[in-house]
Amino acid sequence: MVDIALRSAVVAFMVVSLSAMFTSTQHSEVHIIGFSIPVSLRWNRSQPFEFLVVVELLICAYAFVQFVYQSVVLAKNAVPTRRCIWVQLAADQVCAYLVLAAAAAAAGASRTNKSGFQSLGMQNIKVPGVCIVLDKFCNRATIAIIFTLLAAGASGISVTLDVYMLTLTYYMG
């Protein structure tokens, strides 16, 4: 029962994160030394954000399949085999690490967007950070990262539950 709740939480967190990423598009202009330069940012123009979206889609699909599987096991009142629990443990660990890696990559890119363009290396020319100019994009990316980290936490708890279930199968016979 707890596993089903964790799987549904992962799916919900991923859906919120994906919707934040898919709607994070913004266009603006930067004024430098009298010139107006148009800038725009979208999730698919940054490799870390692309990685985040691809991982979120994969993990969301995996969590949904596991949700359906756990629901069927619960409905049939069946007990999963040790082999099945081992496979689930391995897959859950891979998913938890993947989600954490994607969140870390996106957080690094987001941090660069906030401060990466503070200076061009000249004393008198200052360029504002991307997030000052494109604040809507950065706010939605931050929301996506937060919900991805929540999904990573739920995946980590699911791994712990898998270990507990595996321990029970060894002690129960």
From Swiss-Prot:
UniProt main location, coarse: membrane
Side of membrane Cytoplasmic, spans: 1, 70-84, 162-173
Subcellular location: Cell membrane
Cysteine disulfide partners in this protein: none
Pfam families: CASP_dom (PF04535)
Keywords: Cell membrane, Glycoprotein, Membrane, Transmembrane, Transmembrane helix
Residues on Extracellular side: 23-48, 106-140
Domain of life: Eukaryota
Cellular component GO terms, alphabetical: plasma membrane
Topological type in the membrane: Multi-pass membrane protein
Glycosylated sites: N44, N113
Membrane-traversing stretches: 2-22, 49-69, 85-105, 141-161
Recorded family membership: Belongs to the Casparian strip membrane proteins (CASP) family.
Record note on quaternary structure: Homodimer and heterodimers.
PANTHER family assigned: CASP-LIKE PROTEIN 3A1 (PTHR33573:SF48), CASP-LIKE PROTEIN 4A4 (PTHR33573)
Protein name: CASP-like protein 3A1
Organism expressing this protein natively: Pteridium aquilinum subsp. aquilinum
